[in-house]
């Protein structure tokens, strides 16, 4: 069902992409396209909430941008608070008056996990506040099982999409121009 939603909304794209991690791929998942349609956002959020419910989450936190809407929808179905972390001078922060209490059970959610970099930053941020990060959830896991957050990781869909280091990218070697649709802007 999730893959069909991604295809129907145009969220599953083909081309030459530079991922937020700096790696390259011939496939990209732009979940913002999925969230153009609130009915699909609700389906995805509810399904992810079902997977995370067993962790007794009090607060759901998503990294901006990919986790902002997702954290809200998942939190709604979990009857939890929803926060998002965003970069300030390249560092993930809780801003806008957001806070977590020491011991608060938090879930970190992200639309797509490839290397898990943003999620790991949010986990560290929450630990600095004393939160108890109990799980991570994503719509799509494209990590190939290579990411370890130190807490359970639940995803709605595992996609084995090609990922290349820039120096080994066959698309670059073919001279195909790359798009950079991600939001981190670090690489």
Swiss-Prot record:
Signal peptide residues on this chain, from the entry's feature table = none
Is Transmembrane helix one of the keywords UniProt gives this record?
A: no
Positions with a binding annotation for 5-phospho-alpha-D-ribose 1-diphosphate: 110-118
Enumerate the Gene3D superfamilies for this protein. 3.40.50.2020
Q: Which InterPro entries match?
A: OPRT, Orotate_PRibTrfase_bac, PRibTrfase_dom, PRTase-like
Q: Which domain of life is it from?
A: Bacteria
The GO terms this record gives for MF are: magnesium ion binding; orotate phosphoribosyltransferase activity
Assigned keywords, A-Z: Glycosyltransferase, Magnesium, Pyrimidine biosynthesis, Transferase
So where does orotate get bound? Answer: 114, 142
Q: One GO BP annotation here? A: 'de novo' UMP biosynthetic process
Q: Which reaction does it catalyse?
A: orotidine 5'-phosphate + diphosphate = orotate + 5-phospho-alpha-D-ribose 1-diphosphate
Q: Which cofactor does it need?
A: Mg(2+)
Name of a matching Pfam family:
Pribosyltran
Per the record's keyword annotation, is Transferase included, yes or no?
yes
Q: What class of enzyme is it?
A: transferase
What pathway is it annotated to?
Pyrimidine metabolism; UMP biosynthesis via de novo pathway; UMP from orotate: step 1/2
User: What family classification does the UniProt entry report for this protein?
Assistant: Belongs to the purine/pyrimidine phosphoribosyltransferase family. PyrE subfamily.
Q: How does it assemble?
A: Homodimer.
Q: What does this protein do?
A: Catalyzes the transfer of a ribosyl phosphate group from 5-phosphoribose 1-diphosphate to orotate, leading to the formation of orotidine monophosphate (OMP).
Q: Any idea what this protein is called?
A: Orotate phosphoribosyltransferase
Source organism phylogeny: Bacteria, Thermotogati, Thermotogota, Thermotogae, Thermotogales
The gene behind this protein is: pyrE
